[in-house]
């Protein structure tokens, strides 16, 4: 039986730097897992690439995927849909590949219900003032949207207790290294290693 891959879920409030930290992890030479590209209906930001950062689709296309059961999770956030296509995740995990998701907090909680064996990591800002500076620094939102994001961020940070790990994003390279250390440790946890030994012991006893 092929070893099942591990699902790694990174989420946190808007503006905390999830995408930046994820890029830092995947740009390093020692990353050996696959990134599952999320789907969204929001506008593409400068520097983003369709199919690499997100699949950018229309609202109608996204809702068609929901109706057909093609989404592992999805959420509507500040008037835009975000979600994770299911097919790629299932295929990769079944092939023994570790899969990395970078998703919104509500989506992560949906995944937790469906795939509780995943590794759930909450990326948090050093403080709320720094988070507001980061959102303003994007230059993509007006103050009404920024205020919505900040109110939502407070609610999302309260949900940190539902995660396995919390990582402070004070400096991007440090946050990336902390996450990689968590993943390395999880690969050697008893709950992930034991199924292989149970199969081996079963073969020895037969």
UniProtKB/Swiss-Prot annotation:
SMART domains: GuKc
Paired cysteines (S-S): none
Residues covered by the Guanylate kinase-like domain: 5-184
Enzymatic reactions: GMP + ATP = GDP + ADP
Major location (coarse): cytoplasm
Subcellular location: Cytoplasm
UniProt-annotated binding residues for ATP: 12-19
Name of the protein in its database record: Guanylate kinase
Annotated organism of origin: Lactiplantibacillus plantarum (strain ATCC BAA-793 / NCIMB 8826 / WCFS1)
